[in-house]
UniProtKB/Swiss-Prot annotation:
GO terms for biological process: DNA-templated transcription. GO terms for cellular component: cytoplasm; DNA-directed RNA polymerase complex. Keywords: DNA-directed RNA polymerase, Nucleotidyltransferase, Transcription, Transferase. This is DNA-directed RNA polymerase subunit alpha. Signal peptide: none annotated. The keyword Protein biosynthesis does not apply. DNA-dependent RNA polymerase catalyzes the transcription of DNA into RNA using the four ribonucleoside triphosphates as substrates. Belongs to the RNA polymerase alpha chain family. CDD domains: RNAP_alpha_NTD. Gene3D superfamilies: 5' to 3' exonuclease, C-terminal subdomain, DNA-directed RNA polymerase, insert domain, RNA polymerase, RBP11-like subunit. SMART domains: RPOLD.
Amino acid sequence: MTQVIQKNWQELIKPEKLQVTAGADPKRLATVVAEPLERGFGMTLGNSLRRILLSSLQGAAVTSVHIDGVLHEFSSIPGVREDVTDIILNIKDIAIKMQGDGPKRLVAKKNGPGVLVAGDIQTVGDIQILNPHLVLCTLDEGAELRMEFTVDTGKGYVPAERNRPEDAPIGLIPIDSLYSPVRKVSYKVENTREGQILDYDKLTMQIETDGSVSAEDALAYAARILQDQLEIFVNFEEPKRESETAAIQELPFNPALLKKVDELELSVRSANCLKNDNIVYIGDLIQKSETEMLRTPNFGRKSLNEIKEVLASMGLHLGMEVPGWPPENIEELAKRFEDHY
């Protein structure tokens, strides 16, 4: 394979990292920004990921319900203010997190007067009700109600007809199931700048889930699905960059140490302290002891803990010995291996 062919994908600009901003409810809402992208890629990726998020992620939902004394969904229940049709509509809104395989059966019981909520459902094992305050129905004085739910896992939308087993007993009411843990997805594409070029794409996606999976993780799963589906279209194996691989093996230290400390997203105070102490690379930083760091002007315990936490996430710590550091051609090496840290 020639270098000219490899340029088809190697020279396209792509984001170095995603910008993820949690919403008011961090477990359910997030805004994700990817930039810069080649012109047209914002729409291509945004539309593809949105479709996968809404249709292809696994989740859990109620597939059927049996209500004592009720034969079909058009019935009414003595002492219950809502009719069965309204109760079923409420049941569809139950958000469920289920780790294992289904189907599983859950039971809810209630004596009036009072309100039956999703939290009254008696869960088992790996099942969790995520919106326990959801009202299912209201019972008057003296009313009794018992419901048995069937919960299963799946993807996308499944109509009630497909949820009816062939040997369904009398009184079993199948329910439309929306398995997708993603409730809403929107995206927009704007122009963004990279250097002197003004017409790159900026993709912004707003994602809302039911809480069984975070918005950021849901996007990661959707991207993995897309990646997996596209693999079959690649009819070649890309040769490894032998020279770079050999060079990495020759380095006497981890190439991640060539990363500059100003790329660590530290607080302004911590970053300025490192800059004033002429600490440029991670390799410079990790050779410092905690005592040495605390001697740095304006550098306190809070900054120290912040740096220790960042280094720990990379498998590093202060006070390390690095043989062969600093290399003579450190700037050249840093640029050469920036894709490997």
